[in-house]
UniProtKB/Swiss-Prot annotation:
Family of this protein: Belongs to the primate lentivirus group Vif protein family.
Region of interest: Interaction with host APOBEC3F: 14-17, 74-79
Motif mapping: HCCH motif: 108-139
Chain spans, region Multimerization: 151-164
Subunit structure: Homomultimer; in vitro and presumably in vivo. Interacts with viral RNA and Pr55Gag precursor; these interactions mediate Vif incorporation into the virion. Interacts with the viral reverse transcriptase. Forms cullin-5-RING E3 ubiquitin-protein ligase complex (ECS complex) by interacting with host CUL5, RBX2, elongin BC complex (ELOB and ELOC) and CBFB/CBF-beta. Within the ECS complex, Vif interacts directly with host CUL5, ELOC and APOBEC (APOBEC3F and APOBEC3G) substrates.
Protein name: Virion infectivity factor
GO (cellular component) term, any one: membrane
Residue ranges of the region described as SOCS box-like: 151-180
GO biological-process terms attached to the record: viral life cycle
More info: Vif-defective viruses show catastrophic failure in reverse transcription due to APOBEC-induced mutations that initiate a DNA base repair pathway and compromise the structural integrity of the ssDNA. In the absence of Vif, the virion is morphologically abnormal.
Function noted in UniProt: Counteracts the innate antiviral activity of host APOBEC3F and APOBEC3G by promoting their ubiquitination and degradation. Acts as a substrate recognition component of an E3 ubiquitin-protein ligase complex: mechanistically, Vif hijacks a host cullin-5-RING E3 ubiquitin-protein ligase complex (ECS complex) and the transcription coactivator CBFB/CBF-beta to form an active E3 ubiquitin-protein ligase complex that targets APOBEC3G and APOBEC3F for polyubiquitination, leading to their degradation by the proteasome.
Entry comment, domain topic: The BC-like-box motif mediates the interaction with elongin BC complex.
Native species: Human immunodeficiency virus type 1 group M subtype D (isolate NDK) (HIV-1)
Gene: vif
Length: 192
């Protein structure tokens, strides 16, 4: 019998970003209690040698599983030192992979406060509006004009430490264009 392969999308992530993610998840599970229904599985509880950790996030009947890997083949860049993340949505026997933006939206929908529909009406009438959105990572596009007006009216609370964002975990911060200071950049680099 021939081998059967299953291909998964694994986002290459540097080790420090994975450590930050794990730390934020544990903080909000055990200290702030905002993620107290989440389940953290350590590497020694897994039967797969490449799995570093798993975070199971219940979403109603379904759940989101964020798996971190180690010991993978390195990527094109030297900082891709064999670390990666996969994000999976599971319900009973069905599972599918999701991208970080959708994962953040699902987490936002189930776990964190945001403006209610009545908040817009209350703000127009001059009433105090609360709560504002605690999990900004769950909004991946520009909101309605009413939502933007509310967001400008009520400054979001700064939560220390920030809530764990899957998109932030998987973003490619290395390949973003560098901004230079001033109009012409550094004088020594320009030869002036």
């Amino acid at each position: 019998m021939e081998n059967r392969w299953q291909v998964m999308i694994v986002w290459q992530v540097d080790r420090m970003r994975i450590n930050t993610w794990k730390s934020l998840v544990k903080y909000h599970m055990y200290v702030s209690k905002k993620a107290n229904r989440w389940f953290y599985r350590h590497h020694y509880d897994s039967h797969h040698p490449k799995i570093s950790s798993e975070v199971h996030i219940p979403l109603g009947e379904a759940r989101l599983v964020v798996t971190t890997y180690w010991g993978l083949h390195t990527g094109e860049k030297e900082w891709h030192l064999g670390q990666g993340v996969s994000i999976e949505w599971r319900k009973r026997r069905y599972s599918t992979q999701v991208d970080p933006g959708l994962a953040d939206q699902l987490i936002h929908m189930y776990y964190f406060d945001c403006f209610a529909e009545s908040a817009i009406r209350k703000a127009i009438l001059g009433h105090i509006v609360s709560p504002s959105c605690e999990y900004q990572a769950g909004h991946n596009k520009v909101g309605s004009l009413q939502y933007l007006a509310l967001a400008a009216l009520i400054a979001p609370k700064k939560i220390k430490p920030p809530l764990p964002s899957v998109r932030k975990l998987t973003e490619d911060r290395w390949n973003k264009p560098q901004k230079t200071k001033g109009r012409r950049g550094s004088h020594t680099m320009n030869g002036h």
